[in-house]
Curated annotation (Swiss-Prot):
This is Biosynthetic peptidoglycan transglycosylase. Pathway: Cell wall biogenesis; peptidoglycan biosynthesis. The gene is mtgA. Its EC number is 2.4.99.28. Peptidoglycan polymerase that catalyzes glycan chain elongation from lipid-linked precursors. It catalyses: [GlcNAc-(1->4)-Mur2Ac(oyl-L-Ala-gamma-D-Glu-L-Lys-D-Ala-D-Ala)](n)-di-trans,octa-cis-undecaprenyl diphosphate + beta-D-GlcNAc-(1->4)-Mur2Ac(oyl-L-Ala-gamma-D-Glu-L-Lys-D-Ala-D-Ala)-di-trans,octa-cis-undecaprenyl diphosphate = [GlcNAc-(1->4)-Mur2Ac(oyl-L-Ala-gamma-D-Glu-L-Lys-D-Ala-D-Ala)](n+1)-di-trans,octa-cis-undecaprenyl diphosphate + di-trans,octa-cis-undecaprenyl diphosphate + H(+). Belongs to the glycosyltransferase 51 family. One of its GO terms (biological process) is cell wall organization. Keywords: Cell inner membrane, Cell membrane, Cell shape, Cell wall biogenesis/degradation, Glycosyltransferase, Membrane, Peptidoglycan synthesis, Transferase, Transmembrane, Transmembrane helix.
Length: 245
């Protein structure tokens, strides 16, 4: 056997060992990620998180300076049923029907998307909760994929009621205003359990853009949006909340 053949054999062996090492470490990283994600979701299923990814991101990269952070955790049964229904009506009317990811909505959003435009309108309430809890804010296909994975885990391990409780306690209702209890006290000077239907609709109307929208006093646009949410609430009906169990 010539030196050329020996050299070629050594090179091929090195490449084979490199690929084996690559796949071995990739498998280990995947297993570690799966275990970590299961632990994270299982933890927030039973323990109220002291902080979360979205809040940390805002603290590190605040859109504005000198923001006073307001937050107070409140259990779901202390949140007005109107408020629970309002966020479902505003953000995810199929919340009780899907398993965390609404594949029918994704299919529709893809069909309606203009070429070159990002995918919009397909994130479920569960996906929003997963993003706020665990992921970064910038949009990418990687983040959307992770968001879907965590949403499926949340729906499976936490269930609808706990997911809704998490969402209502960590979602941002204004600069530094986290959770419905802090929002209710800031905007209406009352606890979340005493919100009226109109007040709940106004708070839910903030959710797409809480840093830009205002409800104190509400603009004409916000009144129209709250009116639309109230109509959707009537169509869904309070019986929707029974399907959370």
């Amino acid at each position: 056997m010539s030196e050329k053949d020996l050299g070629g054999g050594k090179k091929a062996g090195f490449i084979a060992r490199t690929w084996r090492g690559f796949w071995r470490w990739s498998a280990r990283l995947l297993v570690a990620f799966l275990i970590l994600s299961l632990v994270l979701v299982a933890t927030v299923s039973v323990i109220n998180p002291p902080t979360w990814a979205w809040r940390i991101d805002r603290a590190l990269f605040p859109p504005k300076e000198d923001i006073q952070v307001r937050h107070q955790w409140v259990p779901l049964d202390k949140i007005a049923a109107h408020m629970q229904l309002a966020v479902i009506a505003a953000e995810d009317q199929r919340f009780t029907l899907h398993n965390g990811v609404d594949f029918a909505a994704i299919k529709t959003a893809i069909a309606d998307r203009d070429p070159g435009e990002p995918l919009r309108g397909a994130s479920t309430l569960t996906q929003q909760t997963a993003k706020n809890l665990f992921l970064w804010s910038s949009r990418s296909f990687v983040r959307k994929g992770l968001e879907a994975w965590f949403a499926l885990l949340l729906d499976t391990l936490s269930g609808k009621r706990r997911t809704l409780e998490l969402y209502l306690n960590i979602v941002e209702f204004g600069p530094g205003i986290y959770g419905v209890e802090a929002a209710s006290r800031y905007y209406f000077n009352k606890g979340a359990g005493k919100l009226s239907t109109r007040e709940a609709a106004l708070l839910a109307a903030l959710l797409p853009n809480p840093w830009s929208y205002r409800i104190n006093p509400p603009t004409a646009y916000m009144n129209r949006r709250a009116d639309w949410i109230a109509r959707q609430m009537r169509q869904l009906g309070m019986a929707t909340l029974k399907d959370l169990d």
